[in-house]
């Protein structure tokens, strides 16, 4: 005999916004593989400099910023977006606040990474370690990050539980810092 406390498939369980979460998770894997592959290529160039084939955008100096930005911002950024969006929905027991804005954060971040992939090997940088991207890309990063903060903190604002889980405090601090 079934217990009445078991939730049936037709009960009013919250339906979460997982499309954006899956997109960020998939891209984190893709960017992780690509970023680390570029790292292997530039490591090999330290031993065999001729691996750049005489093409300027394949030189160590052009590929190293691409590698660091791909691993830090593409892989790490997508992993942060995916995990924070997943966790905030489940700990607050609500869908993401402003669903279309959450989709903008995904496509905006993909555009940021695409712009970095094009501009860094071409040598368009600000020549600042870990802040190489040109100012138009910086503006897009800012727009995406502000949208991210709105979605994340908006989701916390409409939560159905009284307390805020500690994981959300850490994600919130990371977003603000």
Segments from the language model and where they lie:
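Extended, aromatic/histidine-rich regions of cofactor-dependent oxidoreductases associated
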Residues: 127-131
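Hydrophobic cores of alpha-helical transmembrane segments in multi-pass integral membrane proteins
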Residues: 2-3, 22-124, 135-157, 167-177
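Short, intrinsically disordered terminal tails adjacent to the first/last structured region
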Residues: 1-10
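Cytosolic juxtamembrane amphipathic/interface segments immediately preceding
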Residues: 9-23
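Hydrophobic, small-residue-rich membrane helices and short re-entrant helix-turn-helix hairpins
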Residues: 16-19, 160-166
């Amino acid at each position: 005999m079934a217990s009445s406390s078991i939730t049936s498939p037709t009960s009013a369980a919250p339906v979460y916004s997982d499309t954006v979460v899956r997109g960020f998770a998939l891209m984190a894997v893709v960017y992780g593989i690509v970023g680390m592959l570029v790292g292997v290529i530039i490591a090999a160039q330290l031993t065999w400099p001729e691996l750049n084939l005489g093409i300027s955008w394949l030189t160590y100096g052009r590929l190293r910023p691409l590698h660091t930005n791909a691993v830090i911002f593409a892989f790490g950024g997508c992993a942060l977006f995916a995990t924070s969006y997943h966790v905030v929905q489940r700990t607050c027991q609500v869908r993401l606040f402003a669903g279309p804005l959450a989709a903008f954060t995904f496509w905006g971040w993909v555009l940021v990474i695409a712009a970095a992939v094009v501009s860094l090997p071409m040598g368009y940088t600000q020549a600042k370690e870990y802040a190489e991207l040109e100012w138009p890309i910086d503006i897009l990063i800012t727009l995406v990050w502000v949208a991210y903060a709105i979605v994340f903190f908006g989701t916390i604002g409409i939560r159905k539980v009284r307390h805020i889980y500690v994981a959300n405090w850490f994600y919130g601090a990371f977003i603000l810092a």
